[in-house]
Amino acid sequence: IVGGRAAEPHSRPYMVSLQIRGNPGSHFCGGTLIMGWGRLGTREPLPXVLQELNVTVVTAGICFGDSGGPLICNGVAQGVFSFVR
């Protein structure tokens, strides 16, 4: 995340990290990414620190670039999207 800041531990309880039991740090992906860690590609390593930032909500035009992060409204996960028009 460009211009973000490190999130406080446990401040985002709806974010998850899927790992292989007995192999800490071995993140893997399934059919859907449900964590907003800013992955740029399937072969890129995951960052160790979740980041957050404030964004301006737009009501018209095209919004894209989230790449599968969760849609959170008032602290509740409402859905997962990758591209909205």
UniProtKB/Swiss-Prot annotation:
Gene Ontology terms for molecular function: serine-type endopeptidase activity
Keyword Hydrolase: yes
Residues annotated as signal peptide: none
Uppermost EC category: hydrolase
Keywords: Hydrolase, Protease, Serine protease
EC number, as in UniProt: 3.4.21.-
Primary role: May be involved in the degradation of connective tissue in chronic lung disease.
Gene3D superfamilies: Trypsin-like serine proteases
A single GO BP: proteolysis
Record carries keyword Ubl conjugation: no
InterPro entries: Peptidase_S1_Elastase_sf, Peptidase_S1_PA, Peptidase_S1_PA_chymotrypsin, Trypsin_dom, TRYPSIN_SER
Domain Peptidase S1, first and last residues per copy: 1-85
Origin: domain of life: Eukaryota
Family label: Belongs to the peptidase S1 family. Elastase subfamily.
Protein name: Neutrophil elastase 2A
Catalytic residues (positions): S67 (charge relay system)
A Pfam family the protein falls into: Trypsin
Source species of the chain: Equus caballus (Horse)
